[in-house]
Amino acid sequence: MDKKKILLLSDDLRMSSGVGTMSKEFVLGTLKHYDWVQIGGAIKHPDEGKIINMNDSIRKELGVKDANLTIYPVSGYGSQQLLREVMSREKPDAILHYTDPRFWGWLYEMEHEIRQEIPIYYYNIWDDWPAPHYNENFYESCDLIMNISKQTVAIVKEVAKKKPRTDWDCTYLPHGIDEKQFYPIDKFGDEYKNVEGMRKQLTDNNIEFIVFYNNRNIRRKLPGDVVLAFKHFCDQLPKEEADKCCLLMHTQPRDQNGTDLPVVAKTIAPDYKVYFSDQKLTTQQLNYLYNMSDVTINMAS
C-alpha cells in the first residue's frame, strides 16, 4: 500500500531551533511509514525559493530505501499562496503544523478551504496555565490535536467548550529523543576522554559541579534570570565549594534579541564562574556537554 504523505509546517528541520530539532526527530523517525513534505521556516531563510529534495541523503543515512522528504524553505511562516502551490504540486493527505497557532493566522483563515480536501493536525506544546481561551477557534479548526504533556491535554479540554475534544482527536504524544544520539557515556570507556577534553576546553581544572544552560539568548528563555539563580545557589555554599561550581551557557553571549550576558554575569555574579559555549556543535558534541554537566536548568516560558 502506498504511504500517506504529510505536509509539515514548522521551523526548517535542518535548523537547530527547538521546533526544528523536534521536527527532524519525528520526521526521520517515521519515514518508514509516511512520506513528508515540509514548508520549513526561518527568520531570513538562505534557501528561500528553492525546493530541497532530501531523498538521497536520508535514504543513505537511515537505510530506508523508499524514504521521501522534500523541503520548501521560506522566511517566516509561509503564506496562503505558497501553501496552495505546494498542495497542488505535492497533493498531501494531511497538514501538520507545529508551534503556537497564533503564528499561523493565515492558515486558519483558509481552514474551510483546506478541510474540504484534507485534515489539519496540530502538534501542541502549550503546557502552562492559565488556559489560553483565545485559542478556542484555532482548536475548533483542527481535526486532531496531539499534545506534548498530559497537562496540555487538560488545557485543550478546558478551552474547547464549543467543540469538546475526545480521546481520539485530542491525544497525548510527548517529546522523545534518539537514544542512539543522546545517551550516558561510561566514565571508564574510551569515549569519555572526549567528554573530559571538552570539559577542559570550556571550564577549568578546579570545576567539580557544572550547571548547564542550553537555549537561545532571548528574553523568553530568561538567560539573565538563570545567571541570577546561579548566583543565589552559590551564595548558599561555602566559598571553597562555590569556587568549584560553574554555570556553562551554550548560547550566543550577545544577541540583539536578548542581552549582553558577559556583562550581566560580571554585574550580578562577579564572584562566580560563568562560562560560554558559543560555537555550533554536532549532536555528538552536544551529548558530551550533557554528560559533563551535573544538572541542566531550563526556565523558559
Language-model segments: which ranges?
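Nucleotide-activated donor-binding/catalytic signature segment of Leloir-type glycosyltransferases, i.e.
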Residues: 70, 249-253, 258-288
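Acidic donor-binding loop of glycosyltransferase active sites
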Residues: 288-301
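A conserved, positively charged/aromatic
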Residues: 115, 122, 131-147
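N-terminal subdomain of nucleotide-sugar transferases
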Residues: 1-56, 90
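Carbohydrate-associated surface elements
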Residues: 151, 176
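Short His-centered aromatic/hydrophobic patch
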Residues: 97-103
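Conserved donor-binding/catalytic core segment of Leloir-type glycosyltransferases
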Residues: 8, 204-221, 227-230, 247-248
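Nucleotide-sugar donor-binding and catalytic loop/hinge architecture
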Residues: 1-4, 165, 184-210, 237-242
